[in-house]
Amino acid sequence: MSNIDWFKESLSIQPVSRYVEVQGKKIHYLVWGSEEKPGLFFIHGYSAHAHWWDFVAPAFIDKYCAVAIDLSGSGESDHRDHYSQEIFADEIKAVCTDMNWKQADFISHSMGGSISLNATSIYPDLFNSLTLLDSIVVLPPDKVRNFSSNKSMIRADFIYDDKDAAMSSFRLIPP
């Protein structure tokens, strides 16, 4: 198979378009593959939409039923006057409920990753696994304090009680 054949083959597999209502707004999502298989849920990033997964999702349909959502305000979903992490979590849950999924594996890109991370705290039983692609992960301050330059290459935003405490912890790297 040439470098472009797999891409053309993926795009030739057309998804089924569906809608579910969440808090009075229509939320659009796409479905590829047999609904008898385990769920694989794709969540797009900022300024994106469900069709960004058109060439990716078909690669998984031998083992999964793949779904990609248009979060509210994106793609074919309705727009809202107000958006929140909780509303996005409810949209994810509603699609899973519509698909009759009690649990699914999730792959999320960019802003979709932070939305998914938040959704895991609201609907933890829904997530069998979560894969983040190019997403920012913000750790709670109590977890960040355990890192040091000797243990991790993670750049963390530390929270200090005052300016003097912050300045006293400043170190040049490398020393």
Residue ranges of model-derived segments:
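Conserved catalytic-core motifs of eukaryotic protein kinase domains, centered on the activation segment
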Residues: 52-54, 77-83, 141-144
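Structural signature of beta-strand start/N-cap positions in the alpha/beta core
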Residues: 39, 63-65, 100-105, 126-129
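Short, hydrophobic alpha-helix immediately C-terminal to the catalytic nucleophile
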Residues: 54, 93, 117-121
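Conserved HGGG/HGGXW glycine-rich cap/lid loop of the alpha/beta-hydrolase fold
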Residues: 25-76
